[in-house]
Structures are given as C-alpha cells and as structure tokens.
A protein has these predicted regions:
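Catalytic glycan-binding domains that act on GlcNAc-containing polysaccharides
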Residues: 58-245
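Sterically constrained small-residue positions within well-ordered secondary structures
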Residues: 11-12, 127
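Heptad-repeat positions
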Residues: 37, 44, 48-51, 55-58, ...
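Intrinsically disordered, low-complexity polar segments enriched in Ser/Thr/Pro and acidic
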Residues: 21-31, 48-51, 234-243
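Acidic, low-complexity intrinsically disordered segments
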Residues: 14-46
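Bacterial N-terminal signal peptides that target proteins for export
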Residues: 1-9
C-alpha cells in the first residue's frame, strides 16, 4: 500500500512539474482580452455581418436581373405553363437563364430539352435511371459535379431542380462542343457519347435516329423561338399603339 501511495505522490509531483513547464491552454476569452483586442474582434464581427448583408442584397439584384431577362426571352412564360408550384417557377426560370448564359447556349434550348426529357417533372426517373428535370444519369452527374469543383453527394440530389439544371446544362454544352452541332449533341445526350459516335458514323443509322429524339427537341426549340419572336414584335408595337391612342 505504501508503494502505491509513493507512486501516486511521485506522479503528482511530476504532473505539477510538467504543468509548470507547459501551461494548460485556456480558451480564448476565458482569461479576458485586452480592450483593444476585444474591440477589434467586435469590429470584425460587425464587418462580417455587413458583408453577408451586402452579398445577400447583391444576389437579390442579380436574381431580379436574371428573372427580367427570363421574362423578355419567354423563359418565364414557358416555366409558368409547366404546372410547377408557383414558388419554384421564378427560381427555375432564373436557374435556366443563369446556367445557359454561363455555358453559352440558348436558354430556350434548355427549356425545350426539359420539356422533352421530363415534362418539367422534378422527380422523373427513366427506365435506365436518368433523374430529374434534365434526366441526368447519376454517374454523369457525379463526374460533372467533380469537374465543377463540388460533390454531388447522394444521387437523389439530382431531384433538386437547380442542381439538375446546373449539371444538365453543363453536360449539353460539353456535348455541343464535342460533337460540333446541336443535333449531334442531342444524339449523344439521349444515347450516350459512345453509342452516339457509332450512330453518327453511319448515314442510315444517323438519319433514322435524327428523326426521333433530336428532331423532337429541335421542333420544340423552334416553337419556343417563334413564340419569343412574336412576343418581341408585340412589345415593339406597343409604344406605337400608345402614341396613336
């Protein structure tokens, strides 16, 4: 028993010695701060809050500008006809315009593709597993998200319409660049790049396939463009009518 007591006593001495040599780190603020440090910390917190408010306001202005363009292009009108919840329509119209402009493609082509792929059903799943508005395959979505610098996470995240439009539009733009035309890209979007190369390599297969899915999307796109042009013409005539009245 005396041996244990001596050992404990020695341990206490050693711990005390080590503690003296290496002081315990006390959390910041526990010992109090110099007034100037505390004041600086408060200023930084205030500036951080102001920055967050400014960024939120900037995002609001950008969203408003994108939605105005969506109205002018006929995107908002097409989305309103989708049957989606009203609270989603504005955000989707903004997402389509923003992602299309980011990828340098016509926003109405994105709308046409969504109509043909999912009929604006956020939760559409094809027989082969393509998901969401633009029917993005999970593996393709993961690859595109990694390429864009973020993680897709669960494949069900493809049901998020903004994520789906972000990835689907980037994929369409990539295919247009790789295949050299919208029609060729649509073949690849529908059949996959590997099979698309084989389809496009043979005239008979190419003509037959082009008459299906690509023709359907292009027809929808042209219909949307015609509606857009009529709307632009009507807006151009309105000031003249107003002056005559």
């Amino acid at each position: 028993m005396r041996g244990w007591t001596a050992a404990v006593a020695m341990a206490v001495v050693l711990v005390g010695t080590v503690a003296g040599a290496f002081p315990v780190q006390v959390p910041v603020g526990a010992q109090g701060e110099a007034p100037d440090v505390a004041a600086l910390r408060a200023q930084l917190a205030e500036k951080d809050a102001q920055l967050k408010q400014a960024l939120a306001k900037l995002q609001m202005y950008e969203d408003e500008a994108d939605f105005n363009r969506a109205e002018q292009m006929g995107i908002a009108e097409a989305v309103r006809a989708s049957g989606l919840p009203e609270r989603q329509q504005r955000r989707l119209a903004v997402a389509i315009v923003r992602e299309a402009e980011r990828n340098n493609i016509d926003p109405l082509l994105v709308v046409a593709l969504i109509r043909c792929e999912s009929s604006f059903n956020n939760y559409a799943v094809s027989g082969v597993g393509a998901m969401g508005l633009m029917q993005v395959m999970p593996d393709t979505g993961k690859y595109l998200a990694d390429k864009a610098g973020y993680k897709l996470g669960r494949h069900t995240n493809l049901f998020d319409f903004e994520t789906n439009v972000n990835l689907g539009t980037a994929y369409l733009a990539d295919l247009i660049s790789r295949f050299g035309s919208v029609e060729g890209a649509l073949v690849a979007y529908n059949a996959g790049p590997g099979l698309a190369k084989r389809i496009l390599a043979k005239k008979e297969n190419r003509v037959k396939f082009m008459a299906g899915y690509p023709a359907k999307v292009v027809k929808e796109f042209r219909k949307l463009k015609a509606q857009q042009e009529r709307a632009v013409s009507l807006r151009a005539e309105q000031p003249t009518v107003g002056r005559k009245g």
